């Protein structure tokens, strides 16, 4: 994917990351946490232009959970309230057991997509997301068994190397779909040069998604549009609409990037178009 894909006006897939597993309503009252709230947020995001919703689960007290039953409740609400949006479960999580990381894959029906973190990360002072090759392989194996498309989350250059390692070890259905992630800490430093290097280093034929954390969300998704890629926005990654002003909803962030894509001449993909692009 490249600037030529932008010039060709290829459709852009917008993913809405609705909730996340870190901050809660103490950070913003607009963050959806209950299954009903997440279902409503998914429907609103789809109406605004999202074809994929990235889903984390929370307990009633707002804490993160990997329980299959909770993901099932959320999926049921999304399917009840939304139209045709693609559900993508998160399997990422600092401090979670390997077994817990598999639980989001076991809903009935399975999600059409799920995230797959490509390597270790330092996230907090005393906790690390290990994401060993053994865990990555076992998650990928279960995704294949259940017909789930993996979304490879590439947080840094080392994870790009791990992506090639996964391709050497296992068969991945075309197209490979990777999310390039920019921000603080272990993430790729949010510099335009690093973005260009990342897309140049992608496996041949791969489709890429662009994610910038916090204030980097808007400039990086705009670059993603201009370089023929796909984009992710949402309250998981950024709770502000502009400096000092909280976003009122996930849909508000989706509406803005959909408008930018339209003004730059790229059609916003429908869920059916996204399924065709990603070979779901």
Residue ranges of model-derived segments:
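N-terminal small/glycine-rich loop or linker at the start of catalytic domains
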Residues: 4-30, 115-122
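Alpha-helix-loop-beta-strand connector modules within alpha/beta enzyme cores
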Residues: 16, 63-89, 138-145, 197-205, ...
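Histidine-centered catalytic micro-motifs
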Residues: 16, 35, 39-40, 50-64, ...
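Active-site mouth loops of central-metabolism enzymes
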Residues: 16-39, 90-99, 125-129, 153, ...
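Glycine-rich, proline-tolerant flexible connector loops at the mouths of alpha/beta enzymes
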Residues: 26, 51-73, 181-182, 238-243
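Active-site beta->alpha loop and helix N-cap motifs at the rims of alpha/beta catalytic domains
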Residues: 35, 65-131
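Conserved, mostly hydrophobic/aromatic
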Residues: 38, 45, 56, 114, ...
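Catalytic alpha/beta core domains of metabolic enzymes, predominantly
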Residues: 113-236, 247, 252
